């Protein structure tokens, strides 16, 4: 990614020179996207649709429904997630708030990723078992690996901005001492690595599964009902379309993984990722069953699965923006 996103010294110099607390496009997209996901998922928790069934089998979270009941645990999570989303968005005005929101998001996503190891049905027996994942909850939870990278990055970037930008800095143009933004910069670096390789892992895993008949059948409704890509089935067939996607996604994963040593590959890989998630997000508007029976904006499991792509699209845009020099 670019200096505007990843190098605090360069970014700070730009802020001091312009006299504005501006943000790189990538950071704005990441914060806005993650905030939207937490706000939406948090609101859904008050409808009785949520993660409580996943928590029951978790050694870390099973005490919540046991202590508060299913509805109480769902409402507790809803309040926590809504607060997280509000704090993330509040960071546009006051960075320290999104530093707190980012930390809360990272804590939440660490717990949800841990559910992959405790929830029955994560592995898909119809595709041969692990490492083949079921769509829900396996692939649904795997996406949180990428979202976790965003949360860590936002926490670090917000902490860095909150500590490094001051009226004195903007007036004098003198950069702050390293101590003032060192912690934030280190957390940002961890988050950046997590985003890049988390996204690469998702593409690699999802791409490999596209070669199975289970996955080809599973994604068929998304493709068949899409005005953008519905022609894939008539041209390539159900398995052929899935195989093509598998090749595309694995190639995307490889290009993202080699970003540090091949910047041009990063441009191509990030652009491929952006294209992928623009298409998958369009499925929210074309796929039957995206909303729950009570209707929009309450989403079904399929809808929530697709909504997470807002965050993954944010990573892709941030990587593309950064690989192009932050212009």
What are these regions (language model features)?
Residues 2-327:
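Membrane-interface extramembranous regions
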């Amino acid at each position: 990614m670019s200096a505007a996103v990843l190098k605090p010294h360069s970014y700070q110099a730009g802020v001091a020179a312009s006299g504005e607390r501006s943000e790189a496009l990538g950071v704005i997209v990441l914060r806005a996207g993650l905030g939207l996901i937490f706000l939406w998922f948090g609101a859904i928790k008050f409808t009785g649709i949520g993660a409580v069934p996943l928590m029951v089998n978790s050694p870390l979270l099973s005490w919540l429904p046991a202590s508060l009941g299913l509805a109480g645990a769902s409402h507790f999570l809803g309040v926590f997630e809504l607060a997280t989303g509000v704090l993330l968005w509040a960071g546009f005005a006051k960075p320290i708030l999104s530093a707190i929101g980012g930390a809360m998001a990272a804590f939440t996503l660490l717990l949800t990723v841990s559910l992959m190891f405790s929830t029955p049905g994560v592995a898909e027996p119809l595709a041969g078992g692990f490492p083949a994942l079921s769509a829900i909850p396996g692939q649904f939870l795997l996406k949180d690996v990428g979202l976790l990278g965003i949360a860590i990055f936002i926490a670090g970037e917000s902490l860095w901005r909150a500590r490094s930008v001051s009226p004195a800095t903007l007036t004098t143009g003198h950069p702050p001492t390293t101590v003032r933004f060192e912690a934030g910069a280190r957390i940002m670096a961890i988050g950046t690595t997590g985003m890049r390789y988390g996204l690469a892992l998702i593409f690699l895993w999802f791409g490999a599964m596209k070669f199975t008949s289970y996955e080809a059948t599973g994604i068929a409704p998304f493709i068949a009902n899409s005005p953008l890509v519905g022609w894939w089935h008539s041209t390539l067939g159900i398995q052929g379309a899935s195989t093509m996607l598998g090749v595309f996604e694995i190639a995307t994963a490889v290009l993202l993984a080699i970003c540090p040593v091949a910047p041009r590959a990063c441009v191509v890989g990030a652009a491929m990722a952006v294209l992928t998630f623009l298409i998958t997000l369009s499925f929210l508007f074309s796929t039957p069953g995206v909303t729950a029976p009570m209707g929009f904006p309450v989403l079904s499991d399929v809808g929530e699965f697709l909504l997470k792509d807002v965050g993954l699209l944010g990573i892709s845009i941030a990587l593309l923006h950064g690989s192009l020099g932050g212009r």
